[in-house]
Amino acid sequence: MTFVERIKYFLISVDFSISKSFLFSQSRFSKILKDFIYTKLYLLRNNFTIILGKSDLNDFEIPKETVFHTKYSKCYLYKECPEILKKIIKDHQNKIENYLGKNFLFEKVMYYETFNLPEILLKEDVYSNIWHMDSHDGNKLLKIFILLQDVEDNDGPFVYLDRLSTKKNWRKLVNRWTFDKKFLNYDYDEQKKFLGKKGDYLIINTSICSHRASSPKVSRKMLVIDLFPRWTKNNN
């Protein structure tokens, strides 16, 4: 590693450390600052209230092909946004625009199915099944999750904490990969499970709310879309 590379590594480490130490975030401080500036510039809301809703999936077909398949998960990436997601976005467009701004972007519309993990892998990060936050693009993003089947406790529900609960438990959540996360079982009194009927959906900012997948007894199917403000991503 050259001297310049060491300096760059140091600056990136500091960028992350500021956010972890003072902002309860796993994102880089420079990206959070950018989000803050644009939020003020466009007079957007700082907070987004988690939304739970219901949709009609009668005309939705689960894709028969996959683009990524492992022993424990598989996914299909859509080139176009499915109509069911367009309707949900339209139903909540004002709230989404007040938070992300107008002309927000979507990325990675995905059908995702997870399968049962053997006990030896439950503490390994196989398919985001340890507590984490989506830290790659600042702290302004929304994810919409739609259940493609009825989900109960043994169906591997998505598990999450709201923002206040994330802050409250930050000492244990500050890093994604740590020794104690691998060898201790951290559940939280405040955690919530996304249980429900086929077609139920959840809208949440996964960059500020800690969350994880859980292992189903057999499998669990969901449809997922990421929404970003237009200053975060190139629209291509």
Regions found by a protein language model. Give the residues of each.
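Conserved hydrophobic/aromatic beta-strand scaffold that supports enzyme active sites
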Residues: 48-50, 143-147, 191-193, 201-203, ...
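Active-site rim elements
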Residues: 81-86, 186-191, 212
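N-terminal auxiliary "cap/dimerization" subdomain that precedes the catalytic jelly-roll/cupin core
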Residues: 1-105, 196-197
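A general structural signal for short secondary-structure junctions and capping/turn motifs
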Residues: 41-42, 133-138, 150, 192-195, ...
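Double-stranded beta-helix
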Residues: 153-209, 232
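Conserved double-stranded beta-helix
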Residues: 92-161
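Non-heme Fe(II)/2-oxoglutarate
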Residues: 2-14, 19, 23, 36, ...
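Short loop segments at secondary-structure junctions
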Residues: 54-55, 148-152, 164-165, 228-231
